[in-house]
Design a protein with these regions (language model features):
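Core catalytic alpha/beta fold that binds nucleotide/phospho-ligands
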Residues: 1-120
Length: 120
């Protein structure tokens, strides 16, 4: 059976909303890919969706780092896309082979994500 690594992250929507309000596009470009920005901006409350994506990226980083991967992981090296069904899909642009999946949930005030990473 392969090793399985798990990561979880919880984000306050107000913190992400403040980061966007205070640093604007600079923050968005450092954390989110263009595709992620387009997705979040298409929603009625973008901050909630940015928060979910942020939590997902953090959860993925934690799962990958717990596998022993030591290189820095830029936020934009982890892209969270959505299938037509709404299911999130993780795209990794790292020098690390493996399979990663994530689950995201949110309320008006918080977003949470859990990730599973299986090295390849």
């Amino acid at each position: 059976m392969p090793d399985i690594f798990i990561g979880t992250d919880l984000v306050e929507v107000s913190r992400i909303r403040s980061a966007i309000d205070n640093t604007g596009q600079r923050f968005l470009d450092r954390i989110y890919t263009k595709s992620e920005q387009e997705y979040c901006q298409s929603k009625a409350n973008p901050a909630i969706h940015y928060s979910g994506r942020f939590a997902a990226k953090e959860a993925v980083m934690k799962a990958i780092k717990s596998s022993g991967f030591q290189d820095p992981i830029p936020f934009c090296a982890i892209e969270v896309q959505s299938k037509d069904s709404g299911e999130p899909v993780v795209i990794l642009a790292l020098n690390q082979d493996g399979y990663c999946t994530v689950s995201i949930s949110h309320t008006e005030s918080h977003a949470i994500a859990s990730a599973i990473f299986i090295p390849g």
